[in-house]
From Swiss-Prot:
It comes from Homo sapiens (Human). There is a cross-link at K1374, K1496 (Glycyl lysine isopeptide (Lys-Gly) (interchain with G-Cter in SUMO2)). Changing W342S: In BAMS; slightly decreased ATPase activity. Keywords: Acetylation, Chromatin regulator, Chromosome, Disease variant, DNA damage, DNA repair, DNA-binding, Hydrolase, Hypogonadotropic hypogonadism, Isopeptide bond, Kallmann syndrome, Microphthalmia, Phosphoprotein, Ubl conjugation. This is Structural maintenance of chromosomes flexible hinge domain-containing protein 1. Changing H348R: In BAMS; no change in protein abundance; does not affect ATPase activity. The gene is SMCHD1. The modification Phosphothreonine is found at T1499. Residues 1720-1847 form the SMC hinge domain. Changing E136G: In BAMS; has an increased ATPase activity. Changing H263D: In FSHD2; decreased ATPase activity. It comes from the Eukaryota. The keyword Acetylation applies. Residues 111-702 are annotated as: ATPase activity domain. It is found in: Chromosome.
Length: 2005
């Protein structure tokens, strides 16, 4: 093809003569594509090795006939322009070049580019034939297609948008032969890259030099989750292998981005074979370069489909298409027939590329994720069929999707292998749900069998969920490697012994491993090379991933805990509830009869099934319908339990038809059927049984339901039929199976319902009667009133039972009522008394029928009323239940108010008994009129007298009547203020009406009055009026007073005012009296006695007879008016006449000033009130002496008076001068005197000048407010908060009751709680000392006051809250978590530390406060029980480096296996304990030691007779291996048990033989136990009579290196049967006695050991008490021998008080806020790291280090950098790991004036290293490093002179460091001093940035004493407690009960000795006790037993009780 399309022959050449005529030439092929008419072929051109671009271009122009001036470009096929710079590296031999008008010009016609690829075509073509092979029945074709998808994923990895990959199966014969096309929208390939693709095994890592590649300069992608980096096109073989596996020809079509050309390459087996046959270059070919959508070169009909594919290129910017033709027929069939299978396989391979790192999770909302852009679509086109199109994202049944969606939880981990090898792993848990495993089955390769119908008596055993499938599928760079899987790892394989989770849980996990490219895979990507080997290498590190973070931990324990958690959370089993008991089921085979637990309910998948519930079965023949009776669960269960399997017992329904019970597996219950459907089936079956009754009334008189009938009404005859549900009549029960001859009867009953119960009054039974089925006659005897029920009941013929098969037979009940009949007679009801004349009343009537039942009147009747002497009539009579004759009125005379008796006859015409007599008593009626005496109309009386009236109240028949509240009034008119007469006539109806005297004022002549007499309560009674003539009275009526002046008398009227000079006397007062007729009355002695005056107690009677009154003294004050009164009083009148004396002022005498509005004036303000100035007389009475002109004469003077605002005004209304605007110049508060002067008068007043109104709040005795005050969380503030109200001039404002409050943030808590305070009388409020609780950091407080509804804000207090380094918050427990805990051994060491709030370890803690508790874990909870074992910590060893840690060493592990809980506690105080997290340990059995029986058999007694029973030694003997503590162990041991008979003497050869005449027998030992069913002697076996022999059971276990102690069973041998029986009884008694003796001895030994331990404890407590007492004596503290605890308590209280006072004393402190310690790597600010006791030294050193005081010291640079970042670089930091420590000073070095240990000169000023004055509360070593670097060898002396002298001397011998003086001077190390920069300011100028002072030494001494006293108190209490326990134990041992037990032991030992003698057991046997009993622990006489022994004794004493003995 190249020759055909080539240019002219030979071609041109370019070069120089030195090129040697072709040697070293390069041949290039040139296509001229400038114009469309250009030649189609290429022109070969020879280029010399040394040619340049200019020569080459000239040659091109010459060859193609182009003018050199013409513009054109020469490019490569990749459109790379050839220039001078790239000519040599681009123009290579064989290269194809374009001649274009521009680089971006379209190819007007296609070109062909020669390419070479190295391998033989057979290597290429057949590479795919054998690389893809089938494994486990899988077709490899999907894996070959996956190779092409790999290439597409790599090509699209850089796509920003959708990464689209299409696989098109073109199987439509009308479009050509079958083909497979894989198309992607990746970056495409240039022609050179396409050439590279054709080169076999050209890996991306080896493409360099001549090979241009999209992977040139390969760089590994950055790590991403699951290694989903699309870097999976790897080796240069996959695509070609896949192509030639699928078909025999491949067409590669590709267009790179930003390229104008499409490159096309065809490789085919046919073409290769043709070239080989023609001896052509078989590994060369052509790449066709063309424009997009150009398909003119497709001429073969077999490839017609390519036209459509090429047309689609127009819309694509870049793409690559692989078109495979010549597809193998078997592949075509597979692709067609198994479309879903292989697309599902591809979805599995690329699951995580399609769905992302988390897989195909079921998401509730569609989230946009970076992996949603991969779109792999597969389509298959067939002739005449709708195309099949599937997107791999839509496939939901690939295995990974099934794994993801059926998993309940996941466990993620990571493995690091050989450096960069990383494997991410995930394990998913598929729980068991009720009756099935949820582990997904592969739909294509199902491993589970279909459900088969099981027999009812079979047990369904659920097999493992995963089956034999491995756990892990393996993914490489995110894609599946299908033929490699990993079975498991050591840490996730099922354990040999039961672990935390059941074994079956290990079969419920699936997993996936995701490796990066550091693991080798085969070139076909089917298998890993060595993944499993590397992962299972011992150096592989597994870590767990939690919340995306990698955590180093024990992967096996973490996995076990996770699996246990999954099992507990997600595994769901059937819950059996309502436990009823355990039974055996004899209906089952013998091995399955029991035990069976029975339950009344189960809970299955949220649904509850209970006994009695209707259910239906499935998979049973026939299907069962019935009700649940109970549930069965195999096993000895007790209470509620979760389990699988189980059976349900069903009572077949309806029971009337199916009287049987069936039992089926619970799994066969139909959970889908509704209970309604079951109920309907039962009802349909029940339709055959009698259902209802049909009742008719052939003769009438029908009884209707709920009918009400009159008494005596008959009930008609009844006709009855029995019907079933189908409406069919029946007379007997259906079906022969139910005893079909059973007839049915109908029973009739009439029942009366009464309050006393139901009473049966009629009862009949009817049989079926042929024509009339069932019949009952008419009933006429029902007369009683009440509710009735007529009941018809179907009953059985023989038994009269009304139920059948537990179901009631049909019945019918008709309820009716019987009421009364029509009325026949009557009687009177209860009447309303009394009866009054003219007052209507009612007569109630009661009617009865003929049976005496109460009836009602329903007809019209006119009653007749008659009574002698009375007039009677009525209004009406009412009908109905309450019949009443209404409105009966009687009129006539009665004798008195008590009334009169009458007989009233009532007649009702029409009744059988029509009349009745009613006796009544008639009382007088209501009042109707008044009768008044005297009868005269005009009455005459004198004024001032009373008048009586006689009144009577009468009714309408003129009878005197009475009633309640019958009150008669008499009202007078004609004058004011007349009295009212009242009289009560309620009882008698008559009385005398009178009252007070009639008094009319100022009556001068006769006057006429009117009197009206009436009854207010009786409006119907007319009033009576009388006329009264009133005459004037002759008694005293008026009194007058006169003042006589000369001969003239002036009347002083009543209430007159008399003006008189103040202090004077009024003389000559007289009086006169007159009657009502104005007649003067002469004063007699009797009248004079009745005259009184109020101004003097003594009256001259002689003067009164003359009409003279006593003199009146006038008051001295004009304000004090005098009230004078003259009064007269007798029996008729009371008179008075009064006047007021008003004093008048005298002459002017004084000037008086008066303050109004208070005498205090606030500073800066005017006096609120005014000063009023007046002129007074001698008595102080004001005189009107001022006028407006008087103001000029007034002067005001005072010290500090501000006269600028003084205002004086004349007050005309008060005749005074007002002075306002008094103000003082601000100054010290106090009293101010003011002098007021007017003319010759003057006066002084004193004013108090006080502070101004509150304007400020100041803090008293508080540090600087600008800096934050450091406070440790939970501690007190340094000072109390005291605030003072001040005015604006800072004068204290003494305003009390002003509310003071603190404002703060909600997260800042103060104790005591923030309450409102009020200021005291000084204006000061003490808020007290607060304890502060807040999160660490800066917080603010502000004091505010509320004054006059306005807020006065005080200063803001800044608090820097620091964590409390002394407050314990948790316990840190460290121990070896990999250690195993064997019973009876020793625990690993536990290291406990108490962690404070700042995450540091709290040190100096009394070890006695740390304890360890251990108890056995139970189901009741994790709280420690009361009897939990408690341990104390061990003493600190020398090699214990960590300070503040406590160690629990060598603590004994419990003897019994099980799960134990350990918890450590720190006693914070007497009541609060800080507990650690609980440590759960599993105690395992110890080493196997001995062979023991499960149940110790009795000592056998046998003989050698024929009877097997007499020769049987052992039956059902179970032997197992235990450790020293009787824990069963050795479960994994396998071997044999050798049974041998031995005698007491080794020489004894005449020993019995086993059956078979053998001396030894072997028994298998499996799973830690051996079962010996029976052991029988041989018949006529040798042996001596009455001799004891031994059976030695010796274990032989090959896997166990040590020898175990055998089990030895003694037995007695006899030759005589009878003797054997006797001896057997004795042997049994001997065994009982032996057991009893052992129990008694155990009790006594345990009691004695407990006693010894108590003595030991007493001794230890006594020694401890003595030791502490001696230590207290060293501190001069003596403790008395009596009343020790009260004395210690008092001492402690006093010492604590002293210590608290010392701590509260103010001492120097650093107020610089400390930096919050975020971690243990932060030490704090330098100012807080050290303390200095001396104030002067502290001042100068703090100043010297002023620039460093704020620096935060950290241990690491990382921590420093973190603080730097947090503060944006504002905080200076100092990391200790950056300090060069070799230059640090030696803290032990002597001062410079010492040379070689000798004094060089005598210094002055007490020199000392500055660093030696520092004390460090914490972190001493780190602090020495810091201050050693900062201070170096700085020396401090007393003063500057001493420092200068010291320096002068030191420099003579060595370098002199910086010198500081206690006076604050500094001499630098260079000798410079002086100036402000070398002089320390005063302490208060350092702004709190000063080193604090340490706690006083006395405080530390007190702390030691307090600690000792507390320990001594505990020791005294402990000694007292153990003494009491010892005494109690001694008393217990002396009790009669213990003595009795001792006697019983002695008797048992005697009896045992006698029995042994009878048995013939000689003392020789006792030497062989070692054969049967393990050696006992030796005890010594030491009262203190070993620790282990004491513990054992204590435990045994706990266990052994009296009942055991």
């Amino acid at each position: 093809m190249a020759a055909a399309d080539g240019g002219g022959p030979g071609g041109a050449s370019v070069g120089t003569e030195e090129d040697g005529g072709g040697v070293g030439h390069r041949t290039v092929y040139l296509f001229d594509r400038r114009e469309k008419e250009s030649e189609l072929g290429d022109r070969p051109l020879q280029v010399g090795e040394r040619s340049d671009y200019a020569g080459f271009r000239a040659c091109v122009c010459q060859t193609l006939g182009i003018s050199p001036e013409e513009k054109f470009v020469i490019t490569t096929t990749s459109r790379k322009e050839i220039t001078c710079d790239n000519f040599d590296e681009t123009v290579k031999d064989g290269v194809t070049l374009y001649l274009l008008q521009s680089v971006n010009q379209l190819l007007l016609t296609a070109t062909k580019e020669r390419i070479d690829f190295l391998p033989h075509y057979d290597t290429l073509v057949k590479s795919g034939m054998y690389e893809y092979y089938a494994s486990e029945g899988q077709n490899p074709l999907p894996f070959a297609l996956a190779e092409l998808i790999d290439n597409s994923l790599s090509a699209t990895s850089r796509n920003i948008g959708v990464r689209r990959i299409q696989i098109k199966l073109l199987f439509d014969e009308t479009q050509g032969k079958p083909a497979v096309a894989v198309i992607d929208n990746g970056r495409g390939m240039t022609s050179k890259q396409l050439n590279n693709w054709a080169v076999y095994r050209l890996s991306k890592f080896t493409r360099q030099g001549d090979f241009e590649s999209d992977h040139s300069g390969y760089v590994r992608p950055v790590p991403v989750p699951r290694s989903l980096n699309s870097d999976i096109s790897y080796f240069g073989v996959g695509g070609k292998q896949a192509v030639f596996f699928v078909g025999q020809s491949a067409r590669m079509i590709s267009k790179p981005a930003d390229s104008q050309d499409v490159h096309e390459l065809v490789l085919s087996k046919e073409d290769f074979e043709k070239k080989e046959k023609n001896k052509e270059a078989i590994y060369s070919g052509y790449i066709r370069n063309r424009k997009p959508s150009d398909s003119v070169h497709i001429t073969n009909d077999d490839e017609r489909f390519l036209h459509h594919l090429i047309i689609e290129e127009k819309e694509k910017d870049s793409f690559t298409a692989v078109v495979i033709t010549g597809v193998q027929p078997e592949h075509i069939q597979y692709l067609k027939n198994y479309f879903h299978l292989w697309t599902r396989q591809l979805a599995h391979i690329y699951h995580y590329y399609i769905h992302g790192p988390k897989g195909n999770e079921i998401r509730t909302s569609k989230e946009v994720e970076p992996f949603n852009n991969i779109d792999i679509e597969i389509s298959m086109f067939e002739k005449g069929k709708v195309p099949k199109i599937v997107n791999l994202r839509e496939i939901q049944d690939d295995m990974q999707t099934l794994y993801v969606n059926t998993a309940a939880d996941s466990f993620e981990f990571k493995a690091h292998v050989e450096g960069d090898g990383v494997v991410e792993g995930i394990i998913r848990y598929h729980p068991f749900l009720y009756d099935r495993e949820t582990y997904p089955d592969d739909p294509c390769f199902p491993s589970k069998l279909k459900d088969e119908d099981d027999e009812d008596d079979c047990f369904i055993l659920e097999k493992a969920a995963r089956g034999k499938r491995p756990i892990f599928e393996c993914f490489w760079n995110g894609r599946l490697i299908p033929y490699t899987s990993v079975e498991d790892f050591d840490w996730c394989t099922p354990p040999k012994k039961r672990g935390l989770a059941p074994i079956e849980c290990y079969n419920r996990i699936s997993g996936a491993l995701f490796t990066n490219d550091k693991f080798q895979v085969s070139t076909n990507k089917l298998t890993f090379m060595d993944l499993e080997l590397k992962l299972k290498d011992k150096n592989t590190l597994f870590t767990r991933i939690l919340n995306g973070q990698e955590q180093r931990m024990k992967i096996d324990r973490e996995f076990a805990l996770w699996l246990k958690d999954c099992h507990e959370k997600y595994d769901k089993q059937i819950k059996f509830t309502l436990f009823k008991g355990v039974i055996t089921r004899p209906d089952l085979p013998s091995k399955k009869q029991g035990p069976w637990a029975t339950y009344a309910a189960i809970e299955w998948d949220g649904k509850i099934y209970k006994a009695g519930q209707l259910v239906k079965t499935i998979k049973t023949l026939p299907l069962f319908y019935g009700s649940i009776v109970r549930f069965f669960l195999y096993g000895d269960h007790d209470g509620e339990v979760y389990a699988t399997g189980g059976e349900v017992q069903i009572a077949m329904e309806p029971q009337a038809l199916y009287d049987e019970v069936r039992t089926v597996p619970i799994a066969k219950l139909d959970r889908t059927v509704a209970e309604k459907a079951v109920k309907k089936y039962v009802e349909d079956e029940m339709a055959r049984l009698p259902d209802r009754l049909s009742v008719t009334w052939p003769e009438g008189d029908e009884l209707l339901p709920n009918e009400v009938r009159p008494a005596g009404t008959p009930i008609g005859a009844l006709r009855i039929e029995i019907l079933n549900k189908k409406g069919e009549a029946m007379q007997k029960l259906p079906g022969t199976s139910h005893g079909g001859s059973k007839k049915l009867l109908v029973e009739l009953k009439v029942i009366l319902h009464s309050s006393s119960g139901n009473k049966e009054i009629i009862s009949h039974i009817s049989q079926h009667g042929g024509k009339w089925p069932y019949w009952f006659k008419k009933m006429e005897n029902i007369q009683k009133l009440g509710n009735y029920t007529l009941k018809l009941q179907v009953v059985l013929n023989e038994s009269n039972a009304d139920t059948y098969a537990g179901r009631p037979l049909p019945s019918k009940a008709i309820k009716f009522s019987v009421k009364e009949g029509k009325p026949e007679k009557f009687s009177f009801g209860l009447l309303d008394l009394p009866f009054r004349v003219g007052v209507p009343f009612n007569i109630p009537l009661e009617f009865q029928d003929e049976f005496g039942h109460t009836s009602q009147l329903v007809t019209d009747i006119q009653p007749v009323l008659e009574a002698s002497g009375l007039s009677l009539h009525y209004e009406e009579i009412t009908k109905g239940p309450n019949c009443v004759i209404r409105g009966v009125t009687a009129k006539g005379p009665v004798n008195s108010c008590q009334g009169k008796n009458y007989n009233l006859k009532v007649t009702l015409p029409g009744l059988k008994e029509d009349s009745q007599i009613l006796k009544i008593r008639l009382l007088p009626g209501h009042p109707r009129r008044l009768k008044v005496k005297p009868d005269s109309e005009i009455l005459v009386i004198e004024n001032g007298t009373a008048f009586p009236f006689q009144v009577e109240v009468l009714d309408e028949s003129d009878n005197i009547t009475a009633q309640p509240k019958l009150i008669v009034h008499c009202k007078f008119s004609g004058a004011p203020n007349l009295p009212v007469y009242v009289v009560d006539c309620s009882s008698s109806g008559t009385s005398i009406l009178t009252g007070s005297a009639i008094q009319v004022q100022n009556i001068k002549k006769d006057q006429t009055l009117k009197a009206r007499i009436e009854i207010p309560s009786c409006k119907d009674v007319a009033p009576v009026e009388k006329t009264i003539k009133l005459l004037p009275s002759s008694h005293v009526a008026r009194l007058q007073i006169f003042s006589v002046e000369g001969q003239k008398a002036i009347q002083i009227k009543h209430q007159d005012e008399v003006n008189w000079i103040a202090g004077d006397i009024m003389h000559n007062l007289i009086f006169q009296m007159y009657d009502e007729g104005e007649r003067e009355i002469n004063i007699t002695s009797a009248l004079a006695e009745k005259i009184k005056v109020n101004w003097t107690p003594e009256i001259n009677k002689e003067h009164l007879l003359q009409g003279l009154l006593p003199d009146v003294q006038v008051p001295t004050s004009v304000k004090d008016m005098r009230y004078c009164q003259v009064s007269f009083q007798d029996d008729h009148v009371s008179l008075e006449s009064a006047f007021t004396v008003r004093p008048l002022p005298d002459e002017p005498k004084h000037l008086k000033c008066e303050m109004k509005g208070g005498k205090t004036v606030q500073m800066g303000q005017e006096l609120q009130g005014e000063v009023v100035i007046i002129i007074t007389d001698q008595y102080g009475n004001q005189i009107q002496a001022f006028s407006p002109s008087s103001l000029s004469s007034l002067s005001i003077a005072g010290v500090g008076l501000d006269s600028s605002n003084l205002k004086t005004t004349f007050q005309e209304n008060t005749q005074s001068i007002s002075v306002r605007g008094i103000k003082f110049i601000p100054g010290p508060p106090g009293n101010k005197d003011l002098c007021f002067t007017w003319r010759e008068f003057s006066d002084f007043i004193r004013v108090q000048l006080i502070s101004g109104p509150p304007a400020k709040l100041l803090l008293i005795d508080w540090p600087e407010l600008k800096e934050s005050i450091p406070v440790i969380n939970g501690r007190d503030l340094q000072n109390p908060i005291i605030v003072q109200l001040c005015d604006q001039w800072d004068n204290p404002a003494p305003v009390q009751h002003v509310k003071i409050s603190l404002t703060k943030a909600s997260n800042l808590k103060l104790m005591p709680s923030n309450q409102q305070h009020k200021t005291d009388e000084k204006g000061r409020a003490n808020l007290g000392v607060f304890s502060v609780f807040a999160p660490r950091g800066e917080h603010t407080l502000q004091v505010k006051a509320i004054y006059n509804k306005s807020i006065i804000e005080g200063p803001i207090i800044k608090l820097m809250i620091l964590p409390d380094p002394e407050k314990p918050v948790r316990l840190n427990v460290k121990y070896d978590k990999d250690a195993s805990f064997l019973a009876g051994g020793l625990f690993t060491d536990f290291m406990i530390s108490v962690i404070s709030e700042d995450d540091s370890i709290i040190k100096n803690i009394n070890p006695a406060r740390i304890s360890m508790k251990m108890w056995k874990l139970s189901t009741s909870g994790n709280r420690p029980p009361a009897n939990a074992e408690t341990f104390s910590c061990n003493k600190i060893k020398d090699n214990d480096k960590e300070d503040g840690c406590f160690y629990f060493r060598d603590k004994v592990i419990p003897n019994k296996v099980g799960t134990y809980c350990i918890q450590f506690g720190f006693m914070m105080d007497k009541t609060n304990i800080l507990n650690s997290e609980q440590v759960i340990v599993e105690v395992l059995p110890n080493q196997p030691v001995k062979l023991v029986p499960k149940i110790k058999p009795p000592t056998p007694a046998v003989s050698n007779v024929r009877s097997v029973a007499s020769r049987t030694l052992v039956r059902d003997l179970h032997l197992s291996i235990t450790d020293d503590y009787d824990n069963h162990t050795g479960i994994d041991l396998v071997g044999t048990i050798i049974a041998t008979i031995k005698g007491s003497n080794e020489e004894d050869t005449d020993t019995p033989l086993f059956i078979g005449k053998v001396r030894t027998l072997e028994f298998p030992f499996v799973n830690g136990s051996a079962e010996i069913m029976s052991l029988v002697l041989a018949e006529s076996s040798p042996g001596r009579d009455s001799t004891e022999y031994f059976i030695v059971f010796e274990p032989r276990l090959p896997l166990l290196s040590r020898t175990l102690e055998p089990y030895i069973l003694p037995f007695m041998f006899y030759n005589d049967v009878k003797k054997q029986q006797q001896m057997a009884a004795l042997t049994k008694e001997k065994d009982q006695l032996s057991q009893s003796i052992v129990m008694y001895k155990s009790l006594f030994e345990a009691s004695q050991q407990l006693l010894n331990e108590m003595k030991c404890q007493v001794e230890e407590a006594r020694l401890k008490e003595a030791q502490l007492r001696n230590e207290l004596k060293i501190h001069n503290i003596d403790i008395p021998t009596t009343q020790q605890v009260p004395h210690i308590e008092a001492l402690l209280k006093r010492k604590l008080s002293e210590q608290e006072e010392l701590k509260k004393k103010p001492r120097r402190s650093c107020t610089l806020p400390n930096y919050t310690k975020g971690s243990g790597d932060v030490l704090g600010k330098i100012a807080h790291l050290a303390q200095i006791e001396d104030d002067r030294a502290a001042m100068v050193i703090s100043w010297h280090l002023a620039s460093d005081m704020d620096c935060v010291v950290t241990l690491t640079t990382d921590a420093a950098r973190r603080i730097y970042d947090e503060t944006q670089g504002r905080q200076q930091v100092l990391p200790l790991d950056s300090i060069y420590k070799k230059t640090l000073p030696d803290w032990k070095r002597s001062l410079p004036h010492f040379r070689n240990g000798k004094l060089y000169f005598k210094p002055i000023g007490d020199p000392v290293f500055a660093r030696d004055l520092l004390t460090f509360p914490d972190n001493v070593e780190h602090c020495e490093t810091v201050f050693g670097m900062l201070l170096g060898d700085t020396i401090i002396l007393d003063n500057l002179d001493a420092a200068n002298h010291y320096r002068k001397e030191v420099v003579k011998i060595t370098h002199c460091p910086t010198l500081l003086t206690r006076d604050g001077d500094r001499i630098r190390s260079n000798g410079k001093f002086g100036g402000l920069q070398n002089k320390a300011p005063p302490m208060d100028k350092l702004r709190g940035m000063v080193f604090g002072a340490p706690v006083p030494k006395q405080c530390l001494i007190l702390g030691e004493q307090i600690d000792l006293l507390q320990q001594y108190r505990s020791a005294v209490c402990k000694l007292d407690s153990v003494n009491k326990d010892l005494n109690s134990q001694l008393e217990y041992l002396r009790t009669p009960d213990m003595r009795k037990k001792k006697q019983e032991l002695d008797e048992h030992e005697k009896n045992l000795k006698l029995i042994e003698e009878k048995l013939g057991m000689t003392p020789i046997r006792k030497c062989n006790d070692s054969l049967r009993h393990s050696p006992k622990v030796e005890t010594t006489d030491c009262p203190v037993p070993p620790k282990r022994m004491r513990r054992e004794a204590t435990r045994q004493n706990r266990i052994i009780t009296k009942t055991d003995v």
